[in-house]
Amino acid sequence: MSVLLEPDDQILVHASTREEADRAARGLRAVGFLELDGYVLTADASERTEPVEIGELERLLDDDAVTVVDVREKDERDAGFIPGSVHMPYRLLRACGAHSIANGKPIVTICESGARAGIAASVLVAAGIDARPVLHGGIDDWRGNTVEFRRCGSG
């Protein structure tokens, strides 16, 4: 499970396998935590959020079944976004209050590649909000599909 961390927080990774621990370490490095000392293997790994694939996200949006939260930074979103998505950079979720974006629908978080979406979904789940991340792919994969993608200033 991912959580929002401060730069000086100590991190302890619990994992079922070495591969799972390595995957967690890669995710932490992807968001700027470069000094990792190790991990602890456990028999039962923590509860996880089930990821959403791009194709599933398309269907959920067609059915108006979810709210998409774009957790990228403003300059990234300015390059383009999914119409109807809510913008909330992942690093601001705690400060702004996770409940400020809850509207009764399940939430799907998305970023450029998946790392920040995983963190954001975990913050939301910890706040009692039904949230799932797009972990495999992200905005680039959405942009590559034939589904609607809006560039800022294009209406």
Language-model features: locations:
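Rhodanese-like catalytic fold shared by cysteine-dependent sulfurtransferases
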Residues: 1-67, 71-155
